[in-house]
């Protein structure tokens, strides 16, 4: 069996780089570890951390293909972050004009 130790990082392709960068850094407070513009790909690569732990690799591309947005579609459904209070976190996001779903617990 492969001995996994932890999740190293999650790669996300965004459609609006500046908006996504602002969301992860200014709204969620992730720290920028490294930001690189890759001329050959006309693409940014942004490495982000929570508390010095590298967790998200954010990419931008000129015209990425759309993915289904239905919750039941195959692929990454959501990211979940640990916070002290889910309700307060939801209010904070809404106050920063971030669209959120109602809080629910999977059975």
Positions of predicted regions on the chain:
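Core-facing hydrophobic residues within beta-strands of well-ordered domains
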Residues: 4-7, 76
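Short aromatic/hydrophobic contact patches that present stacked aromatics
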Residues: 9-11, 47, 78-80
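Core segments of cupin and vicinal oxygen chelate
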Residues: 12-55, 95
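Vicinal oxygen chelate
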Residues: 16-18, 71-107
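Conserved beta-strand in the GNAT
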Residues: 57-59
